[in-house]
Structure formats: C-alpha cells, structure tokens
A protein has these predicted regions:
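Extreme N-terminal starter segment of soluble prokaryotic enzymes
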Residues: 1-5
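Short glycine-/small-residue-rich Rossmann-like dinucleotide-binding loops
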Residues: 11, 47-49
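Structural signature of beta-strand start/N-cap positions in the alpha/beta core
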Residues: 27, 42, 76-78, 143
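Short acidic low-complexity segments
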Residues: 28-39
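Short acidic/histidine-rich motifs immediately flanking catalytic phosphotransfer sites
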Residues: 37-47
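Cysteine-nucleophile active-site neighborhood
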Residues: 49-121
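Pocket-forming structural segment of enzyme catalytic cores
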Residues: 90-158
Length: 158
C-alpha cells in the first residue's frame, strides 16, 4: 500500500483514522499542506462537526482546490463522515453551504417525521446499491456503526 495523505482541515478524528489505516499496513502522512495533497497518490478526507465549518476549514487552508485538482487527476479518495458529505455540491446543515461539488447532490437532514430517533446513532445494516471496490469485502446487510443527522442525497442514485 502506498502512502496515504490524511487531510487535516482543522476538525476531525484524525488520530483514530490514522491508527486504523496504519493497522492495515498503510503509511500515513497527516497534512494541511495543499502541495502534499496535490502530489498524493491516495487521499483520505476525515471530518467531524458541521458542514459549513468543515468547508471553511478546507478553504482557509487552500485544501478545497487541492482536493479538486487531485480528484481531477483521478487520485483515489475516501471521504469519512463530514469529509464524505463535503464531496457533494451543497450541505444544508445550519443553512446552505457550498461543498466541493465533486459529486452531484445535496446533504440533507433526516425528516423529523421519521419513526427513528435523530441523530441516528448505533448499529444498522448497510444496503449496497452498486458494486464498488470499497465494498468488495463487505457483505450486503453487514452491520456498521452510524452517528449522523444528515445523509447524502445524490441526484443520480447510480
């Protein structure tokens, strides 16, 4: 496994993500330097907190443009939590905020009318809609842990 650039946008669970990656044999470099992101061969974008604050942290460090340029060169990237949400065009948490726009769609709050408690916290089953390398070793229906009040609504579900 090549070096993975772990982006530090000023918020996030960096240490736990770094340890998880190292546990599977990855060499990890934590950085908030756009130049390191631009030269990356793999990127992980973790995040915790509010969408708008997270995007402000990316922009203040010049990481938003660096991520977009890296992805345009087809550098593999994984977004975790708010890092995944940031890949979309708009996040609606505490007002509308512009995301990175790498994926078409919006990050929206779960409806209060749902019969589940929001935030959704706990173990639940995954439903894998499409085959993807990321889910290659994960069975449809596998249990994973969730802690969120918002979800990504892509414009195209494929």
């Amino acid at each position: 496994m090549n070096e993975i650039i772990l982006i530090d946008a000023g918020t996030g669970n960096l240490r736990s993500v770094q340890k998880a990656l190292e546990n599977v044999g990855a060499t990890v470099t934590r950085t908030d330097d756009p130049q390191k992101v631009l030269s990356a061969s793999k990127i992980v974008l973790p995040g915790v907190g509010a969408f708008g604050d997270f995007m402000s942290g990316l922009r203040a460090r010049g990481l938003d443009d660096a991520v977009k340029q890296a992805v345009s060169r087809e550098v593999p990237m994984l977004g975790i939590c708010v890092g995944m949400q940031a890949l979309f065009e708009i996040g609606e948490e505490m007002g509308d905020h512009e995301g990175l726009g790498l994926l078409k769609g919006t990050v929206v709050r779960f409806a209060d009318s749902l019969s589940v408690k929001i935030p959704h916290t706990g173990w639940n089953q995954l439903t894998v809609k499409n085959e993807a390398l990321l889910f290659d070793q994960i069975q449809d229906g596998a249990y994973v842990y969730f802690n969120h009040s918002y979800y990504c609504q892509p414009w195209n579900s494929s």
